[in-house]
Curated annotation (Swiss-Prot):
Domain of life: Eukaryota
Motif position, CX6CC: 520-528
Tissue specificity note: Expressed at higher level in thyroid. Expressed at lower level in adrenal, bone marrow, brain, breast, kidney, ovary, placenta, prostate, skin, testis and trachea.
Keywords: Cell membrane, Disulfide bond, ERV, Membrane, Signal, Transmembrane, Transmembrane helix, Transposable element
Organism: Homo sapiens
Post-translational changes noted in the entry: The CXXC motif is highly conserved across a broad range of retroviral envelope proteins. It is thought to participate in the formation of a labile disulfide bond possibly with the CX6CC motif present in the transmembrane domain.
Residues spanning the signal sequence: 1-38
Region annotation (Fusion peptide) ranges: 439-459
Membrane-crossing segments per the record: 576-596
Name by which UniProt lists this protein: Endogenous retrovirus group S71 member 1 Env polyprotein
Gene coding for it: ERVS71-1
Amino acid sequence: MGPEAWVRPLKTAPKPGEAIRLILFIYLSCFFLPVMSSEPSYSFLLTSFTTGRVFANTTWRAGTSKEVSFAVDLCVLFPEPARTHEEQHNLPVIGAGSVDLAAGFGHSGSQTGCGSSKGAEKGLQNVDFYLCPGNHPDASCRDTYQFFCPDWTCVTLATYSGGSTRSSTLSISRVPHPKLCTRKNCNPLTITVHDPNAAQWYYGMSWGLRLYIPGFDVGTMFTIQKKILVSWSSPKPIGPLTDLGDPIFQKHPDKVDLTVPLPFLVPRPQLQQQHLQPSLMSILGGVHHLLNLTQPKLAQDCWLCLKAKPPYYVGLGVEATLKRGPLSCHTRPRALTIGDVSGNASCLISTGYNLSASPFQATCNQSLLTSISTSVSYQAPNNTWLACTSGLTRCINGTEPGPLLCVLVHVLPQVYVYSGPEGRQLIAPPELHPRLHQAVPLLVPLLAGLSIAGSAAIGTAALVQGETGLISLSQQVDADFSNLQSAIDILHSQVESLAEVVLQNCRCLDLLFLSQGGLCAALGESCCFYANQSGVIKGTVKKVRENLDRHQQERENNIPWYQSMFNWNPWLTTLITGLAGPLLILLLSLIFGPCILNSFLNFIKQRIASVKLTYLKTQYDTLVNN
């Protein structure tokens, strides 16, 4: 803001920062303590408005404090000084959102600024500044060419005399200057976020900061945004193909070249249209149900995204004893790759497999590590799979060739999660939200926390409900496999139809080249014919169908009564789990209450009799016998 437009306030010394308030929370312990649900962690990022560069970040957990603070230097918020003539030429014009503060001040004489010049940044210690929010109600205050500060009425925070260093959403203050002033460490600031639970932080809030200096008030803009923080390790794929870890979102070419000519124009076969039962929404519904049981706060407002490229599934480790039997596995492992395996699990290992050099060394529970025997077969328990280096299977023989490792897992769809505001940013037009955020795989780490640490307990039956939801989701994956089998059937029928068309074309070509001895002679081939081997596909698909039906029957026969209770009506399940605790306490009181009451009454009677005897002894003298 220039001096010709308005009269700026008089300069005074900066107002000292407010003292830090210490809030003590006292938790009262009762005889019965409610089970508390775990709160998710969040990361608050302080970034550049124009480039998205991260200046500072801090971690915050809901319920721990009502404020989030950043420690950052004033010069960190400004861009790096231009070093070359080309960089100077590419600098944005003054007011274009970010300016070269070092070039703006020039570092000549006693002038100050940010950069490597000696004493330049130290001179900023006596310079005031002011801030304007990017979401000001007045539309004229949202001008990025003036750093959201085209007028003094737009200012909400300021360090000069009479200005406020605190607003309803943000406060900023200087901290004591360091004794040793080095580059980007001369003007430390404390930026505090108020009400971190507010939904507006998901979208990100931006401010413009301008220095109160003679002439043009140079400035910069920054953004503070809240993101769900999930700790997760690098994926550990297992299967025949382990190099398919493409990102969930990729740019596709705008145009596709379709100029490749077709050799023959053949009539399209008239296939009967077949409809598959849609399973994607049911899979996402199962994931959200499980997420709602284990992490209800995250499930309140979120977007679930399925991965569009293989591998489509991930595994959650299961610690259980594998069933052994005679060599009776009739199907070989399917060539499906599990994108990641999380948690601890039971493992099968064959001779020659180097587990110490494998990423699954920490995954395999040493007490449940089994060496594969060539005389038996191993079968996964109900609702689980064996994710092997050769593929995915329910049963595996000990005679499988080559070094082999199998991990017992629950197979789950590879799902990515966005918070509600971030998901809306994802589908918004690019001109509204130019900066997209990379998806974070959330499902597997949360489920690993459920099975290892029990961090998802939200009530007395939360763990049982979480296990029930996990089994339900695993069953949904089986249904998805069934749909894949139906899709293979349709593709098989299409291949059969295409084969018929090809044979018809071959007959026509044989007639056309009859004078040359037929098509094979014209092409110079000694033998050319089509061998239809689709019967093998049909037989394999039939076995897959039989295995799915058999596992479904075993699952229905082995459901415990306490798990079947959670398949009832939701309100009835909630009522039963809510009344179970009080009813159990009442039953124990009726059984042991009379005994405890009689013991207490006898104790009281004994104490009363002892007091009476003591009182009587004080009223009389003891007679001495001669």
